[in-house]
């Protein structure tokens, strides 16, 4: 098997070999090359010690000397070069207490997480595949190297990585590896919220975001997203739905494009339903105000998982208003844009579409027609530059002060009253007309 390696990476391999050391590209770059994907990074493993690597190259950065890693700079790119190593005892379910350098490539590959990530390649000696990684790629399987209980005990983040790789590649998790996931899922408590967030986002942004189901079945989501587990066991006895809340969420994830805000919104859009669910005397379920409840819960979840404030703001607002259903008139849609926000309204339309497609077929045509009218009205509002917020109102606070108003709450209240007039009739968004309305309390 011949893999195409970037010229700079091949140069590093050649320099190391010429100096008498072994050197290979290793891990994810080998996996992705075999899969026909374009690797993000090209990592190199070598028998040379860090100080020996530094002696061979003019430009290096000490990125992880304690783990044997030196970054070699070639032109404008950096390549991590790491000495063959054996990890010592893991003291926190995440990091080895110490690492020991070794002269054996096999020992280095043996410590890696999954067989598909434990392959090395060198143009002269070809593919080194000691654990069946190539066969597992061909069979589309995620399998731990060696004993899965040991691999997941060493580093609990591998529990998330197993599901994430499965979702990114569309692979199945091998049976023994899957069993180990279930046993050791509680070890995720040793992993920081930031690291769990990174893996969750990668899973959600994958071609198979619904593989979150695998994480649920293995008891993984119970450790960091128990609110989702509650959704998986909450039925929806209503003609509008044909799935549990959780299954509806999983289906909806597949109906939005690969966008971080959209995918997280779909994950959390109905998170409030288990809390507000009421069943009437006919056995029909109702979920009134689930958007409001969901907004609060989504904020708690996103803060817990250490998401940035901008993502929290966008997602919680979309969760709050995701079930808002204006009719297709431009007047109703102007008010909806004002409520939801100009920046988020296009997202809201995509959320509504995905939500509908993950429901039952009940009144589907009618629902689609209403949504299409909303989209048309929104296009009209945008094309005609109609005012939907204070920032485009023809009158400003300064105008009101010049008209005799005192700075303070009254100005804000007056501007909002004038905005209401304009939302009802955009033709009135003219300075003279609005100033003429000031005496009409």
Q: Where in the sequence are the language-model features?
A:
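Catalytic cores of the polymerase beta-like nucleotidyltransferase superfamily
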Residues: 1-441
């Amino acid at each position: 098997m011949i893999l195409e390696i970037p010229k700079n990476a091949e140069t590093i391999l050649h320099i190391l070999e010429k100096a008498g050391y072994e050197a290979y590209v290793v891990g994810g770059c080998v996996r992705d090359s075999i899969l026909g994907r374009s690797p993000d990074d090209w990592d190199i493993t070598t028998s040379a010690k860090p100080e020996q690597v530094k002696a061979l190259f003019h430009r290096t950065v000490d990125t992880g000397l304690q783990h044997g890693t030196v970054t070699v700079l070639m032109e404008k790119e950096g390549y991590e070069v790491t000495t063959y190593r054996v990890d010592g005892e893991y003291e926190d379910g995440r990091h080895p207490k110490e690492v020991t350098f070794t002269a054996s490539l096999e020992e280095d590959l043996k410590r890696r997480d999954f067989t598909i990530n434990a392959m090395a390649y060198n143009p002269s000696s070809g593919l080194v595949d000691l654990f069946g990684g190539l066969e597992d790629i061909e069979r589309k399987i995620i399998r731990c190297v060696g004993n899965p209980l040991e691999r997941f005990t060493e580093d609990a983040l591998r529990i998330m990585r197993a599901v994430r790789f499965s979702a990114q590649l569309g692979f199945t998790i091998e049976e023994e590896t899957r069993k180990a996931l279930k046993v050791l899922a509680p070890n995720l408590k040793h992993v920081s919220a930031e690291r769990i967030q990174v893996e969750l986002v990668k899973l959600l942004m994958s071609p198979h975001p619904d593989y979150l189901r695998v994480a649920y079945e293995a008891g993984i989501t119970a450790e960091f997203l128990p609110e989702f587990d509650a959704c998986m066991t909450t039925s929806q006895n209503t003609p509008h739905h044909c799935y549990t809340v959780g299954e509806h969420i999983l289906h909806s994830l597949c109906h939005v494009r690969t966008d971080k805000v959209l995918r997280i919104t779909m994950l959390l859009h109905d998170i409030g339903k288990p809390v507000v669910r009421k069943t009437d005397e006919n056995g029909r379920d109702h979920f009134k105000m689930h958007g409001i409840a969901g907004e609060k819960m989504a904020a708690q979840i996103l803060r817990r998982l250490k998401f940035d404030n901008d993502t929290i703001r966008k997602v919680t607002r979309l969760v709050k208003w995701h079930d808002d259903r204006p009719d297709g008139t431009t007047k109703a849609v102007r008010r909806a844009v004002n409520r939801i926000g100009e920046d988020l309204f296009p997202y809201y339309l995509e959320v509504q579409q995905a939500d509908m497609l993950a429901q039952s077929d009940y009144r589907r045509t009618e629902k689609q027609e209403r949504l299409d009218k909303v989209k048309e009205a929104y296009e009209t509002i945008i094309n005609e530059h109609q005012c939907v917020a204070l920032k485009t109102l023809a009158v400003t606070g300064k105008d009101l002060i010049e008209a005799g108003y005192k700075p303070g709450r009254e100005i804000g209240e007056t501007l909002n009253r004038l905005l209401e007039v304009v939302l009802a009739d955009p033709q009135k968004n003219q300075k003279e007309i609005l100033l003429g309305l000031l005496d009409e309390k």
